[in-house]
Curated annotation (Swiss-Prot):
It comes from Rhizobium leguminosarum bv. viciae. Belongs to the chaperonin (HSP60) family. It is found in: Cytoplasm. ATP binds at T30, L31, G32, P33, K51, D87, G88, T89, T90, T91, G415, D495. This is Chaperonin GroEL.
Length: 546
């Protein structure tokens, strides 16, 4: 076992704080409409330019083990916020840094870290309640576009594209973002279906960089039971091979010998194939397989219908223009099912939604309806160079996630104003002075976003915060894009409540843990073995020692 280095108390916390500062300082320059870019060097290809906080955070690894611990904890804040809300990573990082800094000062001044943590938790719960009371539900396409525009750093076209996509496929519909072959960004809505089952073996992958399997003009075999061997399937497999087209198998499971045979055939190049598990369980799985069959114009191979695998012919297989399979999801695009059949199935599901009394069943039926009726919207991101396209794609991904979050929980005034206002409305009291200090730490941290946005815009942060808090109006704030003060919601500067709430809760959670850390353990760096004596130089003979 390698030797360890241990740091205690203040020494350890200061090292950790340095790591927090390094990561947060690199991330927070991207905050706000006038946030700057960060360039990330890549070991292959051109450097990447981004304004996406989590992309910056993920690239940071520090040499000093103790500093790196602090940096990685804050990176966790950004990643977790991104996973839950899909945006707000820079917000979470700025808040975490502010809480850790203030908390560290309080601990150094002799306050009890556990009481500080309790105070922080009390204040955060109070702020979340205040934000939820202030949140405004969004319903119109214009409001959706506003949220998208803000999250895409003021790019109005992105906001409009997202609003249009959501209008066409519904709030629950599937929207994907791809790189375009042209310089223009365009929106395309294609009928299709996505379900949460990925490929059964990574050997089916056709695009190793993105780890996805793309099949074009594909046959789809829908089987209700498990497939353990392929003997009974040989006639249909041979028929598919002769067409030269790929095959997707959707079954309860494909296991053992059957999966191994498919993988070997795929690797040898004899058969373009992929296999996924059927979505859902029990009766719901049967219904979803029927949905896929109707969408693709195929037949479910089911013993209930008296159809056996040996008797399957090509015309019983579904067809689709494209199937895209990732580790977690399968998307079937442009199935060749008859429009009248799809409309009939949609009407049937709508009738079931009306009749059901179970909330769970209703939710699942609505999911199926969205998959059948909504289709898939594809935003194709264009640009002059590959670097520009990747940067724009990052922003559109953020904007899409923020918009979905806004539809779920509503919106609050943007530009850090909602949190700054909440700092003046914390009414909860701590049980002692140290808890009260924890509450005040959150109070000060909540103003850090407005400060950072103003700093990035080249304005005097203290003056901006003072002016904003002087006026006792919930929506009054500072528009860094135009350097004007006014009603943030009227100016279209809004943030999704889910993003703001998640960022604050995650930042406070990790910051509290850092404040209450008393010992840190890391491996000692390995010492290099001393270099050996140089060998004698050939051809010169030995040297006489005098």
């Amino acid at each position: 076992m390698a030797s360890k280095e241990i740091k205690f108390g203040r020494t350890g916390r200061e090292k950790m704080l340095r790591g927090v500062d390094i990561l947060a300082d690199a991330v927070k320059v991207t905050l706000g409409p006038k946030g700057r870019n960060v360039i990330i060097d890549k070991s292959f290809g051109a450097p990447r330019i981004t304004k996406d906080g989590v992309s910056v955070a993920k690239e940071i690894e520090l040499e000093d083990k103790f500093e790196n611990m602090g940096a990685q904890m804050v990176r966790e804040v950004a990643s977790k916020t991104n996973d839950i809300a899909g945006d707000g990573t820079t917000t979470a990082t700025v808040l975490a840094q502010a809480i850790v800094r203030e908390g560290n000062k309080a601990v150094a001044a002799g306050m009890n870290p556990m009481d500080l943590k309790r105070g922080i938790d009390l204040a955060v719960a109070d702020v979340v309640k205040d934000l939820q009371a202030k949140a405004k539900k969004i319903s119109t396409s214009e409001e959706v576009a506003q949220v998208g525009t803000i999250s895409a750093n003021g790019d109005k076209q992105v906001g409009l594209d997202i609003a249009e996509a959501m209008q066409k496929v519904g709030n629950e519909g599937v929207i994907t973002v791809e790189e375009a072959k042209t310089a223009e960004t365009e929106l395309e809505v294609v009928e299709g279906m996505q379900f949460d089952r990925g490929y059964l073996s990574p050997y089916f992958v056709t695009n190793p960089e993105k780890m996805i399997a793309d099949l074009e003009d594909v046959f789809i075999l829908l089987h209700e039971k498990k497939l353990s061997n392929l003997q009974s399937m040989l006639p249909v497999l041979e028929a598919v091979v002769q067409t030269g087209k790929p095959l997707l198998i959707v079954a309860e499971d494909v296991e053992g010998e059957a999966l191994a045979t498919l993988v070997v055939n795929k690797l040898r190049g004899g058969l373009k194939i992929a296999a996924v598990k059927a979505p859902g369980f029990g009766d719901r799985r049967k219904r979803m397989l029927e949905d896929i069959a109707i969408l693709t114009g195929g037949t479910v191979i089911s013993e209930d219908l008296g159809i056996k695998l040996e008797s399957v012919t090509l015309d019983m297989l579904g067809r689709a223009k494209k199937v895209s399979i990732s580790k977690e999801n399968t998307t079937i695009v442009d199935g060749s099912g008859a429009k009248t059949d799809i409309e009939g199935r949609v009407a049937q599901i709508k009738a079931q939604i009306e009749e059901t009394t179970s909330d769970y069943d209703r939710e699942k039926l609505q999911e199926r309806l969205a998959k059948l009726a909504g289709g898939v919207a594809v935003i194709r991101v264009g640009g002059s160079t590959e670097v520009e396209v990747k940067e724009k794609k990052d922003r559109i991904d953020d904007a899409l996630n923020a918009t979905r979050a806004a539809v779920q929980e509503g919106i609050v005034p943007g530009g850090g104003i909602a949190l700054a206002r909440s700092s003046t409305k914390i009414t909860v009291k701590g049980a002692n002075d140290d808890q009260e200090a924890g509450i005040n730490i959150v109070r000060r941290a909540l103003q850090s976003l407005v400060r950072q946005i103003a700093e990035n815009a080249g304005d005097e942060a203290s003056i901006v915060v003072g002016k904003v808090l002087d006026k006792n109006e919930d929506n009054f704030g500072y528009n860094a894009q135009t350097s004007e003060y006014g009603d943030m919601i009227a100016m279209g500067i809004v943030d999704p409540l889910k993003v703001v709430r998640t960022a604050l809760q995650n930042a406070a959670s990790v910051a509290s843990l850092l404040i209450t850390t008393e010992a840190m353990i890391a491996e000692l760096p390995k010492k290099d073995a001393p270099a050996g004596m140089p060998g004698g130089m050939g051809g010169m003979g030995g040297m006489d020692m005098m």
